[in-house]
């Protein structure tokens, strides 16, 4: 039996202007998982964000972030169907239907609704 790998899940902040910031809080911060499992990652915004501006990224050590999902639910080019995104308002989700060995990475949500 393969030992579970660590899937890291971090917090990303955007500072939209001098008066208000949108804080994106992701949970859980880490997961111990095995290949084949279903994974659900959550992202909550401190204020409502248009779905059109919500993106998810995957990052592996030593590599640039890879765009997975844009517009909250649209897969980027060449992203496998096991990745799906959903949500609106303040609550968004990234789901990996069956975790593959190559999916062990850091995942970020980002909002582009309000930028600095």
UniProtKB/Swiss-Prot annotation:
Residues 110-116 are annotated as: Complementarity-determining-3. Transmembrane segments: none annotated. SMART domains: IG, IGv. Disulfide bonds join 43-109. Residues 44-55 are annotated as: Complementarity-determining-1. GO terms for cellular component: extracellular region; immunoglobulin complex; plasma membrane. Residues 21-43 are annotated as: Framework-1. PROSITE patterns: IG_LIKE. Residues 1-21 form the signal peptide. Residues 71-77 are annotated as: Complementarity-determining-2. Keywords: Adaptive immunity, Cell membrane, Disulfide bond, Immunity, Immunoglobulin, Immunoglobulin domain, Membrane, Secreted, Signal. GO terms for biological process: adaptive immune response; immune response. Residues 78-109 are annotated as: Framework-3. It is found in: Secreted; Cell membrane. CDD domains: IgV_L_kappa. Residues 22-116 form the Ig-like domain. Residues 56-70 are annotated as: Framework-2. Immunoglobulins are composed of two identical heavy chains and two identical light chains; disulfide-linked. PANTHER family: IMMUNOGLOBULIN LIGHT CHAIN. Probable non-functional open reading frame (ORF) of V region of the variable domain of immunoglobulin light chains. Non-functional ORF generally cannot participate in the synthesis of a productive immunoglobulin chain due to altered V-(D)-J or switch recombination and/or splicing site (at mRNA level) and/or conserved amino acid change (protein level). Immunoglobulins, also known as antibodies, are membrane-bound or secreted glycoproteins produced by B lymphocytes. This is Probable non-functional immunoglobulin kappa variable 3-7. It comes from Homo sapiens. The lineage of its organism: Eukaryota, Metazoa, Chordata, Craniata, Vertebrata. The gene is IGKV3-7.
